[in-house]
A protein has these predicted regions:
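Residue-level signal for inorganic ion chemistry
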Residues: 1, 18, 112, 141, ...
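Anion-binding (especially nucleotide phosphate/pyrophosphate-binding) glycine-rich loop
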Residues: 1-83
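Structural signature of FAD isoalloxazine-binding scaffolds in flavoprotein oxidoreductases
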Residues: 22-40, 88-118, 133-140
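Solvent-exposed residues in well-ordered beta-strands and their adjoining turns
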Residues: 36, 108, 143-148, 180-182
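A gly/ser-rich beta-alpha-beta helix-loop segment of oxidoreductase catalytic cores
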Residues: 62-103, 174, 178-180
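Flexible, small-/acidic-enriched active-site or ligand-binding loops
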Residues: 121-130
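Oxyanion-binding "anion nests"
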Residues: 152-172, 178
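Conserved small/polar residues in nucleotide/adenosyl-binding loops
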Residues: 185-188
Length: 188
Protein backbone atom coordinates (compact mmCIF):
# COMPACT_ATOMS: atom_id res chain seq x y z
CA UNK A 1 0.00 0.00 0.00
CA UNK A 2 2.87 2.38 0.84
CA UNK A 3 4.68 1.70 -2.42
CA UNK A 4 1.43 2.13 -4.37
CA UNK A 5 0.72 5.47 -2.67
CA UNK A 6 4.27 6.63 -3.41
CA UNK A 7 4.05 5.48 -7.04
CA UNK A 8 0.77 7.37 -7.51
CA UNK A 9 2.14 10.37 -5.57
CA UNK A 10 -0.69 10.14 -3.06
CA UNK A 11 -0.17 11.55 0.42
CA UNK A 12 -0.46 8.77 2.99
CA UNK A 13 -0.58 8.34 6.74
CA UNK A 14 0.26 5.17 8.67
CA UNK A 15 -2.23 4.50 11.47
CA UNK A 16 -2.11 1.86 14.20
CA UNK A 17 -4.85 1.98 16.83
CA UNK A 18 -5.10 5.76 16.61
CA UNK A 19 -3.79 6.58 20.07
CA UNK A 20 -1.70 9.77 20.13
CA UNK A 21 -3.41 10.85 16.90
CA UNK A 22 -5.79 13.74 16.41
CA UNK A 23 -7.21 14.32 12.93
CA UNK A 24 -8.61 17.61 11.73
CA UNK A 25 -12.38 17.82 11.26
CA UNK A 26 -11.53 18.60 7.64
CA UNK A 27 -10.26 15.05 7.22
CA UNK A 28 -7.16 13.85 5.41
CA UNK A 29 -6.82 14.16 1.65
CA UNK A 30 -4.90 11.00 0.98
CA UNK A 31 -4.62 7.36 1.91
CA UNK A 32 -4.76 6.19 5.53
CA UNK A 33 -2.96 2.86 5.80
CA UNK A 34 -3.99 0.86 8.85
CA UNK A 35 -1.34 -1.29 10.49
CA UNK A 36 -3.38 -3.57 12.69
CA UNK A 37 -4.66 -7.12 12.81
CA UNK A 38 -2.95 -8.09 9.55
CA UNK A 39 0.41 -7.25 11.13
CA UNK A 40 -0.04 -8.42 14.70
CA UNK A 41 1.99 -11.58 15.10
CA UNK A 42 4.15 -12.50 18.09
CA UNK A 43 6.72 -15.30 17.89
CA UNK A 44 9.23 -16.67 20.37
CA UNK A 45 12.39 -16.97 18.25
CA UNK A 46 14.74 -18.46 20.84
CA UNK A 47 15.31 -18.22 24.60
CA UNK A 48 14.23 -14.73 25.63
CA UNK A 49 14.12 -13.35 22.06
CA UNK A 50 10.72 -12.39 20.69
CA UNK A 51 9.78 -11.11 17.21
CA UNK A 52 6.70 -8.89 17.16
CA UNK A 53 4.91 -7.25 14.22
CA UNK A 54 4.17 -3.52 14.25
CA UNK A 55 0.37 -3.82 14.42
CA UNK A 56 0.46 -5.75 17.68
CA UNK A 57 -1.24 -4.06 20.60
CA UNK A 58 1.32 -3.13 23.26
CA UNK A 59 -1.05 -4.44 25.95
CA UNK A 60 -1.48 -7.74 24.09
CA UNK A 61 2.29 -8.07 23.79
CA UNK A 62 2.70 -7.43 27.52
CA UNK A 63 0.08 -10.10 28.30
CA UNK A 64 1.82 -12.62 26.02
CA UNK A 65 5.21 -11.93 27.60
CA UNK A 66 3.67 -12.54 31.04
CA UNK A 67 2.09 -15.79 29.81
CA UNK A 68 5.48 -16.94 28.49
CA UNK A 69 7.25 -15.94 31.71
CA UNK A 70 9.31 -13.19 30.09
CA UNK A 71 9.92 -10.17 32.33
CA UNK A 72 10.61 -6.59 31.31
CA UNK A 73 7.57 -5.45 29.32
CA UNK A 74 5.14 -5.06 32.23
CA UNK A 75 5.30 -1.25 31.89
CA UNK A 76 3.43 -1.53 28.56
CA UNK A 77 0.39 -3.37 29.94
CA UNK A 78 -1.81 -0.28 30.01
CA UNK A 79 -0.32 1.68 27.12
CA UNK A 80 -2.85 2.07 24.30
CA UNK A 81 -1.69 1.75 20.75
CA UNK A 82 0.41 -0.56 18.66
CA UNK A 83 4.02 -1.55 18.83
CA UNK A 84 4.98 0.38 15.67
CA UNK A 85 3.96 3.68 17.20
CA UNK A 86 5.36 2.62 20.55
CA UNK A 87 8.78 2.07 19.01
CA UNK A 88 8.61 5.31 17.03
CA UNK A 89 8.05 7.31 20.21
CA UNK A 90 10.00 5.04 22.57
CA UNK A 91 6.85 4.53 24.62
CA UNK A 92 7.23 3.94 28.30
CA UNK A 93 5.74 4.19 31.75
CA UNK A 94 6.66 3.37 35.33
CA UNK A 95 10.43 3.35 34.81
CA UNK A 96 10.35 1.15 31.72
CA UNK A 97 10.51 2.01 28.04
CA UNK A 98 11.00 0.37 24.65
CA UNK A 99 14.72 1.12 24.56
CA UNK A 100 15.23 -1.10 27.63
CA UNK A 101 14.36 -4.29 25.75
CA UNK A 102 14.51 -3.77 21.96
CA UNK A 103 17.24 -5.49 19.94
CA UNK A 104 16.33 -4.51 16.36
CA UNK A 105 13.56 -2.89 14.35
CA UNK A 106 12.77 -3.73 10.75
CA UNK A 107 11.61 -0.59 8.96
CA UNK A 108 10.62 0.64 5.53
CA UNK A 109 12.62 3.75 4.64
CA UNK A 110 11.52 6.65 2.43
CA UNK A 111 13.01 5.03 -0.68
CA UNK A 112 10.94 1.88 -0.12
CA UNK A 113 13.89 -0.18 1.10
CA UNK A 114 13.50 -2.58 4.03
CA UNK A 115 16.21 -2.00 6.63
CA UNK A 116 17.05 -3.67 9.94
CA UNK A 117 18.20 -1.15 12.54
CA UNK A 118 20.00 -2.21 15.71
CA UNK A 119 18.91 -0.69 19.02
CA UNK A 120 21.68 1.94 19.03
CA UNK A 121 20.82 2.96 15.45
CA UNK A 122 17.25 3.72 16.53
CA UNK A 123 18.47 6.74 18.54
CA UNK A 124 15.82 6.12 21.17
CA UNK A 125 15.38 9.03 23.56
CA UNK A 126 12.62 10.40 25.74
CA UNK A 127 9.57 9.93 23.48
CA UNK A 128 11.63 10.18 20.31
CA UNK A 129 13.58 8.07 17.82
CA UNK A 130 15.18 8.16 14.40
CA UNK A 131 11.94 6.63 13.10
CA UNK A 132 10.20 9.97 13.63
CA UNK A 133 13.11 12.00 12.25
CA UNK A 134 13.53 9.93 9.08
CA UNK A 135 9.83 9.06 8.69
CA UNK A 136 10.53 5.34 8.66
CA UNK A 137 7.66 2.87 8.90
CA UNK A 138 8.10 0.14 11.51
CA UNK A 139 7.30 -3.35 10.22
CA UNK A 140 8.44 -5.53 13.13
CA UNK A 141 10.97 -5.70 15.93
CA UNK A 142 12.99 -8.13 18.00
CA UNK A 143 13.14 -7.87 21.78
CA UNK A 144 15.06 -9.60 24.53
CA UNK A 145 13.53 -10.41 27.91
CA UNK A 146 14.81 -12.22 31.00
CA UNK A 147 12.95 -15.25 32.30
CA UNK A 148 10.62 -14.60 35.19
CA UNK A 149 7.76 -16.08 37.15
CA UNK A 150 4.54 -15.70 35.09
CA UNK A 151 2.40 -15.12 38.19
CA UNK A 152 4.84 -12.53 39.55
CA UNK A 153 4.91 -10.74 36.19
CA UNK A 154 1.09 -10.71 36.02
CA UNK A 155 0.90 -9.38 39.60
CA UNK A 156 3.31 -6.58 38.68
CA UNK A 157 1.15 -5.72 35.66
CA UNK A 158 -1.99 -5.65 37.81
CA UNK A 159 -0.21 -3.32 40.26
CA UNK A 160 0.86 -0.94 37.49
CA UNK A 161 -2.63 -0.93 35.97
CA UNK A 162 -4.13 -0.22 39.39
CA UNK A 163 -1.77 2.72 39.84
CA UNK A 164 -2.70 3.93 36.34
CA UNK A 165 -6.44 3.75 37.15
CA UNK A 166 -5.86 5.67 40.41
CA UNK A 167 -4.07 8.52 38.62
CA UNK A 168 -5.87 8.78 35.28
CA UNK A 169 -9.55 9.20 34.40
CA UNK A 170 -9.62 6.11 32.14
CA UNK A 171 -13.42 6.11 31.95
CA UNK A 172 -13.40 9.36 29.95
CA UNK A 173 -12.14 10.11 26.43
CA UNK A 174 -8.61 11.45 26.54
CA UNK A 175 -6.00 12.91 24.22
CA UNK A 176 -3.37 11.14 26.33
CA UNK A 177 -0.35 12.69 27.95
CA UNK A 178 0.13 16.34 27.12
CA UNK A 179 3.40 17.17 28.82
CA UNK A 180 6.74 15.43 28.89
CA UNK A 181 8.12 14.55 32.28
CA UNK A 182 10.53 17.30 33.30
CA UNK A 183 13.98 16.27 34.40
CA UNK A 184 15.21 18.40 37.27
CA UNK A 185 18.87 18.93 37.98
CA UNK A 186 20.41 20.33 41.11
CA UNK A 187 23.79 21.96 41.49
CA UNK A 188 26.54 19.77 42.96
Amino acid sequence: AVLYAKEKKLPFYILGKGSNVLFSDEGFRGVVIEVGKGMSGIALERAGVVRVQAGTSMSAMAAKMAEWGLAGFEFAAGIPGTLGGGIAMNAGAYNGEIKDCILTATVLDQSGRVRILKADELELGYRTSIIQKEEYIVLEAEFYFESGNPEGIKAHMRDLNSRRRDKQPLEFPSAGSTFKRCLLYTSP
